[in-house]
């Protein structure tokens, strides 16, 4: 296990941060792809339609071509959707990390190992929190695939929690996709509670891709720890 340390983002990290974020998002495409294939209405199209083609026309070739094109188009849809989301992020908050986070009462941290950035996480204040709450939102958690299993993701989340405590926040909140199984397991294992879920569009509802909302409530300075 290679040693690592966590520090605040510096401008020289920018290219590596973008690459790490992009690769991390692309890793979710296969999970979403296989998830959709298991849905009941997907089974009508694959393998339902190929079987029907064989029964009606007797053509295995036509059924094979349909199956290939169906899988190719489905994979392409998810890939393009992912790339569009990444491009949107790269043109938004990740275009100028210092301005988006460090100069906006938040922060952006990187985990460094062997002189390379291998993990990232960010945090920003929630603009309109519930009445009586002061909330910090966790963003952009990602760890290089070659450096997972070393506790880096957990350490990055702890950095955000400590930052929130130091700044007097009452909660740390975050959103994540329901296909991000490892992230969900990490958050729940660290004490985050699922407080809601929603669909960003009708299309996402139809294919069962939802967004989970998690909250970690921080004890007040006067509240005794159990």
From Swiss-Prot:
Top-level enzyme category: transferase
UniProt keyword terms in alphabetical order: Acetylation, Acyltransferase, Developmental protein, Gastrulation, Membrane, Transferase, Transmembrane, Transmembrane helix
Molecular function in Gene Ontology: N-acetyltransferase activity
Record-listed E.C. numbers: 2.3.1.-
GO biological process assignments: gastrulation
Topological type in the membrane: Multi-pass membrane protein
CDD domains: NAT_SF
Entries under InterPro entries matching the protein: Acyl_CoA_acyltransferase (IPR016181), GNAT_dom (IPR000182), NAT_camello-type (IPR050769)
Protein localization: Membrane
Residue ranges of the TM segments: 33-55, 60-82
Family membership: Belongs to the camello family.
Described function: Probable acetyltransferase. Has no detectable histone acetyltransferase activity towards histone H3 or H4.
Name of the protein in question: N-acetyltransferase family 8 member 2
Species of provenance: Rattus norvegicus
This protein's encoding gene: Nat8f2
């Amino acid at each position: 296990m290679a040693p690592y340390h966590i520090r605040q983002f510096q401008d020289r990290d920018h290219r590596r941060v973008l690459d790490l974020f992009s690769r991390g998002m692309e890793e979710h495409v296969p999970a979403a792809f296989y998830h959709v294939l298991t849905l009941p209405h997907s089974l009508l199209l694959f393998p339902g339609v190929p079987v029907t083609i064989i029964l009606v026309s007797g053509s295995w070739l036509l059924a094979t071509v349909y199956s290939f094109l169906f899988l190719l188009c489905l994979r392409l849809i998810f890939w393009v959707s992912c790339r569009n989301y990444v491009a949107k992020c790269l043109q938004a908050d990740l275009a100028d990390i210092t301005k988006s986070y460090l100069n906006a009462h938040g922060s952006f941290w990187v985990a460094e190992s062997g002189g390379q950035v291998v993990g990232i996480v960010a945090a920003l204040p929630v603009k309109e929190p519930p009445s009586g709450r002061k909330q910090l939102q966790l963003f952009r958690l990602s760890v290089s695939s070659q450096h997972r299993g070393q506790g880096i993701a957990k350490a990055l989340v702890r950095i955000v929690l400590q930052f929130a405590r130091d700044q007097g926040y009452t909660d740390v909140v975050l959103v994540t996709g329901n296909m991000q199984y490892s992230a969900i397991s990490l958050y729940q294992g660290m004490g985050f509670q699922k407080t809601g879920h929603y669909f960003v569009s009708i299309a996402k509802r139809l294919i069962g891709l939802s967004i989970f909302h998690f909250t970690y409530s921080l004890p007040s300075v006067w509240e005794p720890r159990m």
